[in-house]
A protein has these predicted regions:
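A short beta-strand-turn-helix
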Residues: 28-48
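Conserved helix-turn-beta segment immediately C-terminal to the redox Cys motif
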Residues: 46-47, 62-86
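Short, solvent-exposed loop/turn and secondary-structure capping segments
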Residues: 61-64, 95-98
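Thiol-based oxidoreductase modules, predominantly thioredoxin-like and allied folds used
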Residues: 80-96, 113-118
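Short, internal strand/loop/helix patches
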Residues: 100-118
Length: 118
């Protein structure tokens, strides 16, 4: 429970770095793991968690290996909070994955994001 609260606080802190709570976030659109366009505007009026993730990052590995992140994702999505996992590593760079690899990682880790965006 302590780790869950700390993780949520960290996510809240990171999210508030450029957009204040209650303000409208700038819109963006990205393709998801199924090659469908997902726009932030689709979730207007809903609470959204943006998770920048990199499967090779030791901190990300730790949270997924302990199933800490999956538990938080499931709790949030079960409570109608949108969870967008964003993999922003460029092709040829550390952490890059294809859409198929993103699907495999999500399945292997038993992750529960609403979408994985690439």
């Amino acid at each position: 429970m302590r780790i869950k609260i700390l993780s949520l606080l960290l996510l809240s802190f990171l999210a508030s770095a450029s957009v204040k709570n209650g303000e409208i976030a700038p819109s963006f659109s990205l393709l998801n793991q199924d090659n469908e366009s997902v726009s932030l505007d689709e979730f207007k009026g809903k609470k959204i968690i943006l998770e920048w993730t990199n499967h090779d990052c030791p901190f990300v590995k730790r949270h997924y290996d302990t199933e800490n992140m999956q538990t938080i994702q499931k709790d949030m999505t079960d409570n109608e909070i949108v969870w967008l996992s964003i993999i922003s590593s460029a092709k040829g760079k550390q952490g890059y994955v294809t859409k198929e690899q993103a699907k495999e990682l999500t399945s292997e880790r038993n992750a529960h994001p609403t979408h994985v965006l690439l």
